[in-house]
Amino acid sequence: MTSHGEEIEDEQISRIEKGNCKDSQGGMETAICSSPSIVCLTQKLIAEMIGTYFIIFSGCGVVVVNVLYGGTITFPGICVTWGLIVMVMIYSTGHISGAHFNPAVTVTFAVFRRFPWYQVPLYIGAQLTGSLLASLTLRLMFNVTPKAFFGTTPTDSSGQALVAEIIISFLLMFVISGVATDSRATGELAGIAVGMTIILNVFVAGPISGASMNPARSLGPAIVMGRYKGIWVYIVGPFVGIFAGGFVYNFMRFTDKPLRELTKSASFLRSVAQKDNASKSDG
């Protein structure tokens, strides 16, 4: 049996696929932020490209600076930089494109019917373009030595790196699903929550795999620098982890009602039960 809410969601998705988007008050949120007005696809693609560009430029750039200038940034500084730039770009472009910046996130949103499939290849193309341009910019700006490679390669075995990428990608998408697609969450804090998750993930998995969580983050530097060692890890790992994170959260989310509505209903039922018990005792 199909619920009324599911019927409404299917209708909204059909409108989006036809280009008839609805705003955040009456429509479906497709990612980190929702826009109050219709935004043409070209603007969304430009926002995705610019957002991905500055994420790669800042995150990978700080890695290069740290190596070339004697470790002045330090590992904690690198972790914080990645989280901050993701947070900044979410708040800067989320209301335009949804702030995916990640092919695996885009595909997962589409799989769970929160993003139109026809836009998926266009979004992925914009994300890869942003990553390639940022990587090319860094190569032109700095004398990038093999030691200062700003891509991602497994530190030890590919198996260890794969496990690390799956776990941290799972956590990333689990958080994104919670703060971006659940109407009960506080959407204004989405950027902070996702940024903090990035910081934690880089702290934990950075020494093992480089903490990519994003095929675009790894493919751009690999293509520009011509280094493809273990690149499959950074395609398979994020896709598996992000899909699993989205699946688990969607499995857990049993209702779309805000918490205040659930608590009101619970209070009402308790009052009815108390009155019923009181009437029985009087009788």
UniProtKB/Swiss-Prot annotation:
Residues with PTM Phosphoserine: S267
Subcellular location: Membrane
Segments carrying motif NPA 1: 102-104
Pfam families: MIP (PF00230)
Record-level GO cellular component terms: membrane
Transmembrane segments: 51-71, 77-97, 120-140, 161-181, 189-209, 231-251
Alphabetic keyword roster: Acetylation, Membrane, Phosphoprotein, Repeat, Transmembrane, Transmembrane helix, Transport
Domain of life of the native organism: Eukaryota
Positions of post-translational N-acetylmethionine modification: M1
Sequence motif NPA 2, residues: 214-216
Membrane topology: Multi-pass membrane protein
Biased composition range(s): Basic and acidic residues: 1-21
Role: Aquaporins facilitate the transport of water and small neutral solutes across cell membranes.
Protein name as it appears in the record: Probable aquaporin NIP4-2
Gene (name only): NIP4-2
